[in-house]
Amino acid sequence: MPESKYRQQTIRAPRGTVLTAKSWLTEAPLRMLMNNLDPDVAENPHELVVYGGIGRAARNWECYDAIVDALTRLEADETLLIQSGKPVGVFKTHDNAPRVLIANSNLVPHWATWEHFNELDAKGLAMYGQMTAGSWIYIGSQGIVQGTYETFVEAGRQHYNGTLAGRWALTAGLGGMGGAQPLAATLAGACSLTIECQQSRIDFRLRTRYVDEQAATLDDALARITRYTREGKAVSVALCANAADILPELVNRGVRPDLVTDQTSAHDPLHGYLPSGWCWEEYQKNAQSDPRGTMQAAKRSMAAHVRAMLAFSKMGVPTFDYGNNIRQMAKEMGVENAFDFPGFVPAYIRPLFCRGIGPFRWVALSGDPQDIYKTDAKVKEIVAEDKHLHHWLDMARERIHFQGLPARICWVGLEWRQKLGLAFNEMVRCGEVSAPIVIGRDHLDSGSVASPNRETEAMRDGSDAVSDWPLLNALLNTASGATWVSLHHGGGVGMGFSQHAGMVIVCDGTDEAAARIRRVLHNDPATGVMRHADAGYDLAVECAVEQGLNLPMVAATQGKG
């Protein structure tokens, strides 16, 4: 690894109201960049890795320093351009333009492979931004907890008469994304057994209360699961082992979980999935000396992993891919029926996307947890009738450990995002919270991603691979005045399999911010309703009509009906 990708330095975002940059609109991206690299947030901050294999916040440390310098100097009518983690230009725009525009990991489709990307990365010409790593809005595992919780809850509704009490989920992976699974299962009322091959990750999840217990052996783990499910307790258990070994063993023993999924970093076979029989140090060494052989070894293990998942599915166990592209990797290794079990979006989440409901998140730039608790109360006040959401907020306050700057996520839709943003802006204006708040989201949202093996799998009209939609989302958020906008490739499922966009907007208490919030927090989720209405989903068409969206072709179709 080039020296510029490693630095023994601890980075934490400033707290309070003293500015390092010239305004809150440039202070916000500066703090959020730094927050992504906080050791309480990032998986490997010394190498700029935030989460998801090699998802970085900046291309190298020289680029990081240059980004920080540019943001501290940026004027109110200038825009900083970031190309794969490198600051490449500052241009005069206008006050309501984004302060930062980011493009990460984008490759011409024919060359959009891990092999070509890794060559560029080795030359210092590219950076893998994942989704929220390179777009500076990662908030730790909380960022995916509610989405995973909603998935488990819906699985309980569909398969177990609305409750997961006395049930258990089998999964793997305790990294930045997978680490949400055990807590989400617990919050949904289920026990869980999560396989993780790195003890350090288990230790972190135990320390932050995302995992309740660690078992010493597989027999110990199964004994715990049996005891807790019999007692109706929702307890999460971790086991340090390789999923490619454990899942086939469970199949051979005839063990029958109640849900099976996976959230290892299978999207990146070179850095994110330990081959069976290897130790982590051997994996890292071989990734440098023999990348092709290492990737093949990882994918062979993924094939064994997926064959076991298929066996569980054949037993009648609800089994689903949680968006890491492990089915694709297995299919490339000869598992022709790898896609016989579905992804989580078509199985459980798409009805939410049809109404523009997705991962709305916000961060208190003050660093004061009380600011988040006050906004929690405001959400309950505004979305007064949604008791399911209230329950989520109560559980989140009780169980979720803040990582870095205090943050919250809750899944809300087109009807509410603008209202909540305006309310937060008013709280800043009136001094109810001590500093501005940033509002963003995961790129995993209803209108901001094209990913045929994940968010857009099995679209009704067959438009799974059409990536015009995230491009339009990024363009519209730019035109609407988001504070920073990002357009990435390869997040979640790896090179060649996704394109996606993100946005963040600052609530600084000004009238100008309120005007931008009205545009951005309406238009952004509205693109999701538009995308699903265009694909023929009745729920989305109904939502578009209810919210008064101007969708010419949908209106024409409705008129013909």
From Swiss-Prot:
**What exactly does this protein do?**
Catalyzes the conversion of urocanate to 4-imidazolone-5-propionate.
Active-site residues per Swiss-Prot or TrEMBL entry: C410
The EC category is lyase
Pathway it works in: Amino-acid degradation; L-histidine degradation into L-glutamate; N-formimidoyl-L-glutamate from L-histidine: step 2/3
- Name what cofactor the protein needs: NAD(+)
What does the UniProt cofactor note say? Binds 1 NAD(+) per subunit.
Give the catalytic activity. 4-imidazolone-5-propanoate = trans-urocanate + H2O
Q: Where in the cell is it found?
A: Cytoplasm
Record-linked InterPro entries: Urocanase, Urocanase-like, Urocanase_C, Urocanase_central_sf, Urocanase_CS, Urocanase_N, Urocanase_Rossmann-like, Urocanase_sf
Q: Which organism is it from?
A: Salmonella typhi
GO BP of this protein: L-histidine catabolic process to glutamate and formamide; L-histidine catabolic process to glutamate and formate
The enzyme's E.C. designation: 4.2.1.49
Q: Which Pfam families match?
A: Urocanase, Urocanase_C, Urocanase_N
- One GO term describing the cellular component: cytoplasm
> Know the name of this protein?
Urocanate hydratase
Q: MF terms per GO, please?
A: urocanate hydratase activity
